[in-house]
Structures are given as C-alpha cells and as structure tokens.
Amino acid sequence: MEVTRQNFKEVLPEVCNAVQEADFISIDGEFTGISDGPSVSALTNGLDTPEERYTKLRKHSMNFLLFQFGVCTFRYDQNQSTYITKAFNFYIFPKPFSRTSPDIKFICQSSSIDFLASQGFDFNKVFRSGIPYLNQEEECQLREQYEERRGQMNGAGPVSYTPPSGTGVCNVPEDQREFIRSVEEKVEALLKNTDQTLDLEPCTGFQRKLIYQTLNSKYSKGLHVEALETEKKERFIQISKVDDEERRRREQQKQQREQEELNDAVGFSRVIRAISKSGKLVVGHNMLLDVMHTIHQFCGPLPEELDDFKEVAMTVFPRLLDTKLMASTQPFKEIIHNTSLAELHKQLRQKPFRPPTTECPEGLQSYDTSTEQLHEAGYDAFITGLCFISMANYLGSFLTPPKSHISARSKLLEPFYNKLFLMRVIDIPYLNMSGPDLQPKRDHVLYVTFPKEWKTSDLYQLFSAFGNIQVSWVDDTSAFVSLSQTEQVQIAMNTSRYAESYRIQTYAEYLQSRQKNTHSSRKWASDGWADTSYPSVAMTTASGYSHTDNWHQAVKRSISPSLDEQNHGADSSWTNYSVKKIKTEGSCTQTYADVAGSCDWPRLQADEGGASVSPVAEEAELDEFSANQSQGKRSRKHKKRKSDASETTPPALFDVPQVW
C-alpha cells in the first residue's frame, strides 16, 4: 500500500496494529545518494575497522535523505500454514511544519537519482506528497514553542521584552506604540458595536506578541484572541467577543488543534516508534545504512563513537537480522553464490529451499514477485521477508525430526541476531551490534603513503618481488597492501627505509598513529584524557525507545590462502572461515567482492557433564549434521579462554569465533 501525506493519518492505526500483530517486520529504505565525497571503493575499504567504517558512513552518507521507507509485517497463520503479509510503501519528505520548524537541507547524488529514475521512481510524489517527520529533539523544541506561545497569551511575558513589575501592563517599545494604540481603538469599537469578530491586518510575529500581551492585560475577560493564516500564508490576529465558557471552549479546541498539528509534524517518526515499542525482530538486507539513516533521521543525531551508536541502535531496535549476512554464512554459503537481494530471492525459490506461502488481507495492495518491482522500498521489504522465511525454514531441515516451519523467535536464529553485514571488508564479516567486534590479525598488512600521481600499477611494481599482493585504496595518497606471507613484512620495511617518494608502515604502526591523532583532538581532564561531551537528546517515555545517556586493485590478484589451508590446528570452538579470491577488473571503483563465508552453522556445545541444549522445546533434537559436532554449551568465560588459546595456533589471515 502506498502511503503519502494525504492518507497517512488514516493508514497509521492499521500500520500500528499490523506491527503489534506481526511475528517479525522487514524494512528497506531508498536514499538520495550514498557518498558525498569518497568513491564507493574508498568509502568501503577492504581493511576498514568497524570504527573506521562507521565514522566514514556517518561523515559521508548522513547528509542524504531517506525519502522512501518500506515496511512489511509478517504474521504466521498456524491453521493455514500461511504468512499474512501487510506491506506499506511510505513516501517521506521533511516539509517544514511552520516558519519556526526545522528547514532540512539534504544533498543528492546524480548517479543515485539517475538509477532510481531508470527504475520508475516517482520523485514528484516524494516532494509533493511526502510524509513529514520530526526527531525527538525537534519534537521537544516544538512543544516548548507551543508552551511559550501559550504562556505569552496568558500574560507570562514574551521572550524579547519584560512587563514592568506590578503594573500588569506590558512595556511596548516606542516604535510600536502607535500600532498598539490603533489596535486598542479597534477593539474598543468592537466592544461597542454588534459585530462579533474583528480581523486585524497581517503583522509581524513580534507585533502579534504585543497584541496578545496588551489585550490580555487590558481585557482579561470577554475576548478571545487567535492567530490565523490567510490563503497567502500571511499570519493575522482575529479577535472575538465571547463569554467565559465560550472562551474556555475555544482555548480547549485550540489546544486540541495544536496537538493534532504536532502529531502531524512528528509524522512518519510515529511509525518508527511503533516498531521500536513492539520489540519485534526487524529484518533487513545489507541493512547498516538503513539502520543508521533511520536513527539519524527519525530519532536523533548519530553519536560520534561506534559503541555509543550500538547502544542507541539496540535501544531503538533490540533485535536486528541481516539477510545478506545470513546468506553469507553456514549452512547457506555453499549453496548461495550471489547475495544481492534480487538474486538471493531467485535462488531461495529453488531447491533445497521452499518459498513460503503468503496471503495479503483484502483491501491491501499485494505484491506479485513475478513483476519484480525492485527498488521500491515496500517491495524490497516484502522480498527481504520472504528470503528470511525461506532461510529460517531451511534451518529446520537440520532438526530431528525435520520441521517445515521455524518461528521468528526460534533459538536457531540467535546466531544471526544483531550482526550487520559489513560490505567489502575482507576479514570482518559483520558489525556486532550487541557486543565487541572481531579483531582479525593483520600482521601481513602494510600501510603505504605515496605521491598523488601513483596508480595501482605503481604499487604492484613496488612490491613485485613479494609475489601475490592485494591493494586496498584508502585515499589518493595512501593504500593498504596485503602481502601473502607475514615474514615478508620486515623485508619490505627494511627495503623502504631510505625511500624518499613513499613511506611504509606496519599495520600496528598505522593504528598507533591514528590513536595519537585521536588523543590530540581530546580534552585534558584532571583524571586524564576525556572525550568531548556529546549533547544529550531528550527522550520521551511515550516513545518506543528512551535513551537517557549521551546520544550518543586493478589487475587480477588473489589474497592469501583460505584459513582452511593455513590453520589446520585451530581449536574446535572456532569456525572454519573460508575466503574466496577477490578479483578486480580495471580501476578500483569496479571492485565488487563480498566475503562469501562466515561461521559454521550450527555448532552447539553442552556444559561439562551436562545434557546437550536444544534450541527450543519444539525443536528438541538436532540431526546428525549438528549432533556430530555438538559438545555442549560453554560459558562465556570458557569461550574467552578458548579464544586466548587460539592465538597459539599457526597464523591465519583472520580468526572468526563461532556465533553460537
């Protein structure tokens, strides 16, 4: 169903009910662009740390506008073995609510706009009929404006001037006294004749304040004063003769109108709050940008630090699942060879997967997957949910006896919760939203700085004696170079000691230099370095999320051998994480390599001397696939000891702990 400003108020209750009834919710967003500076390859460097990737996206992607948001709710009908789906396609545009409301500025990227236009995107519908929104800070400011205005009407005094003490009459500036005198004369005439209302000429906001103050102090009873707007959007004062009861009634009506106006201004943010308040599983595809934009646009400014962002994100969306990451992990990675949304949907309609049966209630627009309305946010959210169901049900085939339906609340899905796919990062497959991120070994990586004129071929020439290498550009004058063997690092460092045109650092030295730069931008407190404080955002308990803390390349080359070939002695509690060769054609901007591997699924372990742990009561036994590997569920401390012990194993490109 298409939702615009014209039908949003009517559809909102249905959206909220669908969210409350859903087993899970899938989302998708369309943006006016991706990067305002770096190329996509520089924005998504293969050796970014999670902190670096977050900082880049926060700095270079948040000035674009999320202007179409898709929501699809899925509720499983046990009797019919069918999913009831309700898809909503929201057009969003930050139309200023009033002269004092935020006037949002955003940027567009021509390639993104051109692509959406080629897909039939209706830009007119966005700009003419887009649903407005306010984040929580903006909503609080608007409420304060209403309270201030109401206080001025009741004689509390305006901001720009102060009534003299004890007189009860406001202090009118000399240049406005003639204007106020003429208003008083017109009011006196109104009180003497039979007219019921008086419309004054349009005037400035300051003059309207003076009128409110003067009439409130001089005529405390018998008059109702209200600011209205002409067809030309000009504001004027209307004065009406009323008794006390009528005045109270009109004041109540005005407050109700203001509350409705405020709700209209909050707009689409109410949908996000409903989803957040529900606590339901939120599913997306390659959803890091979707989550960042959603929080930034509808909740509040993104914190500077990654850990603060994780805390905020987990407050807004307690459970997230990324289908791109799910498709890239065991047991799917050996079957699924292309994890783009369209291709993933096609592959999951074939054996060994089974597409789910869905049904759309009468009166709601349903999507036909045969028409492939890709890059319409509502449709993309719909097929993202279908992909999730197909993969979740496939996990049921590993149970004994096999189950054809796996609930969105099943513990079989817990390994995939709150892990968002990291695009093109070679050795860190996901961003762990609910815990510390993986820290791969990068002893074989060098950081090279060089003149701006250098090309990728120059770097390959420089390191030609070291065999296969991989180049990951950072910017125009620096890049990471991954060597095939760690032992070669010292040789490269010694060789470059007296070089004048370039400089080489180990990856550890590179990190140290970045930390020094970070310290230099921090303040010195009495107890040491202190981060610059991040402004807190007022959070209302009425919303679904309340956060009281601070709101926070270019020739064909292959990387090192897979971990299977390098780390035969790895501990059993660690996974076999394979790495596919990454090939590039032409310039680095044409590199499109997804890490096609992740943690083996499933691998359960039991407490020492205890029974094996079943995922859920109805899914009591794992089949032979997992039973042969199952040794019981260990405590977190025990897992940490295993993690530390693994460092004594032969060096690998990276080590990925299992997610169970």
Curated annotation (Swiss-Prot):
Top-level EC class: hydrolase
Site features described as Interaction with poly(A), chain residue numbers: 324
Superkingdom per UniProt: Eukaryota
Required co-factors: a divalent metal cation
Chain ranges of the R3H domain: 177-243
Catalytic activity: Exonucleolytic cleavage of poly(A) to 5'-AMP
One term of GO molecular function: 3'-5'-RNA exonuclease activity
Transmembrane residue ranges: none
E.C. numbers: 3.1.13.4
Any one Gene Ontology cellular component term annotated for this protein: nucleus
Sites bearing Phosphothreonine, chain numbering: 649
Name of the protein: Poly(A)-specific ribonuclease PARN
